[in-house]
Amino acid sequence: MKANYKKYLLNFKHPSGTSRGVMTEKETWFLMLEENGKTGIGECGILRSLSVDDRPDYEEKLKWVCDNIDLGKEELLAELTHFPSIQFGVETAFLSLVSKTPFELFPSDFTKGTTSMSINGLVWMGEEDFMKSQIEEKLESGFTCIKLKIGAIDFKRELELLRFIRQNFDAEKIEIRVDANGAFKPDDALEKMEQLAKFNLHSIEQPIKANQISRMRLLCENPPIPIALDEELIGVYGIENKNELLEKIKPQFIILKPSLVGGFSGTLEWIAAAEKLSIGWWITSALESNIGLNAITQFTYSLNSKLPQGLGTGGLYTNNVDCPLEISNGQINYNPSKKWNIKNLE
């Protein structure tokens, strides 16, 4: 078996803001395998300052994977515990290699194009007018669940944006999720959540920064809005530690990004730990290209979750890979008549 990797820079169509800053581009790496005339491809992508494997020896580790590809998937994954995004790329590349086609990883009614999956529409942070125009565009596009990034502009103005939505659509028509990316201070998080609760929100992601276990546990005890852990799950290895974290905090939901939590296997460990405690979950992409998004979407469909997933990020870039994934009326579907085009990766 031969393996190589290629770095690729994804360019955002518009600067995209979170409470951690504004992104104009995103680095990713493609891991390519070749054996007996068949090819496999996986994506290894990090989010700077967030991924636990955002470290100087990242590319060196990718080279090590290529040099040692004959160790096989399981042994490689065991050696890559501290590089969850490379675990995801390795899992996907090996699956791609043995699949009927390199991109049909989990054959299903979804990949046949006969069914679709509900997703949330993502509204990025920015100036009030920009956020308002995104909200209007998502609602016109048929989304029934939207997710707003909050914590970057003045909180009162963010409340006004929520008021704008609720004046036009009640919670029966539009489900709203908010993502604070840890922007609230522990001392005023509860008060802010109480103000947000007036707008009948589905959930709030990561209201305070990760690794404040006792403060997060208190917030989760009787929250005005259900709390979903996100960044809190990063860098937690092994099923015992996953169980322990969820038992301590007892959140209402967890959000799983395969590139940040150790690929499909790490995601399945978190789901098992959550379901034991009756904690809900959904899966989101971590701004991967369509290569990674396709893998995550097919995997997610196979798990049969009824909640809207966070998989609507394929249209963010000017130089993404053409693929059969399509979004229509708040649903993501796979159109088998559309072809993959990975020429710009060559």
Where are these regions (language model features)?
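N-terminal capping/lid subdomain adjacent to the active-site entrance of alpha/beta enzymes
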Residues: M1-I176, N181-A183, D187-L190, E194-A197, ...
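Short glycine/serine- and small hydrophobic-enriched flexible loop segments
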Residues: S96-K100, A272, Q298-Y301
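Catalytic core of soluble alpha/beta enzymes
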Residues: I153-N294, Q298, Y317-S328
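Short helix/strand-capping turn motifs
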Residues: N304-Q309, T313-G315
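Short, solvent-exposed coil/turn elements at secondary-structure transition points
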Residues: Y8-N11, M125, L233, L287, ...
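Active-site donor-binding loop signature of nucleotide-sugar glycosyltransferases
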Residues: C44, Q206, L311
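Structural signal for conserved beta-strand scaffold positions within catalytic alpha/beta enzyme cores
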Residues: G121, I255, G310-L311
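Long, contiguous hydrophobic alpha-helical segments, chiefly transmembrane helices and signal peptides
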Residues: I150, I291, Q309-L311
